[in-house]
Amino acid sequence: MARFPITIKGFHKLEQELKHLKYVERLKITTDISTAREFGDLSENAEYKAAKERQLLNDKKIYDLENKLANAEVIEITKINSNSVKFGARVVLLDRDTEKEVVYQIVGEYEADITQNLISIASPIAQALIGKKAGDIIEVITPKGGRFYELLKVQYVDF
């Protein structure tokens, strides 16, 4: 797995998810397996099979999260001093079609959440913004065609 950028906040969120899977979910599943064993014949025990499937799924999630954490490149965005857009930037854009301002923060792919205006570094809009400065006009290609934005402000602050 290649290294990937992530904010400190995103890294801690993945750590918390891993702890929950290891110390809460795993314990619950182990208890469910023990309880299901008491029902008798394991070859026809649906509860046992379901609990074992949940155990496999949980173990896979744990493995995946451990790999993500091992390959994460934590970026402390408040220490970035730049007037151009890079990973971690909070940008204020003016949509040239609607004349409405929109604010996005560019984050890693595992912490993106459009409902919180957190966009992945791999997204088309983030890719169009990388390297740009306040005052630049950018075009983002969407399935409905090009969309133009004016970059009003670039900041490096926590979200």
Swiss-Prot record:
GO terms for biological process: DNA-templated transcription elongation; regulation of DNA-templated transcription elongation. The keyword DNA-binding applies. Keywords: DNA-binding, Transcription, Transcription regulation. The keyword Electron transport does not apply. GO terms for molecular function: DNA binding; RNA polymerase binding. It comes from the Bacteria. Belongs to the GreA/GreB family. Necessary for efficient RNA polymerase transcription elongation past template-encoded arresting sites. The arresting sites in DNA have the property of trapping a certain fraction of elongating RNA polymerases that pass through, resulting in locked ternary complexes. Cleavage of the nascent transcript by cleavage factors such as GreA or GreB allows the resumption of elongation from the new 3'terminus. GreA releases sequences of 2 to 3 nucleotides. HAMAP family: GreA_GreB (MF_00105). This is Transcription elongation factor GreA. It comes from Orientia tsutsugamushi (strain Ikeda) (Rickettsia tsutsugamushi).
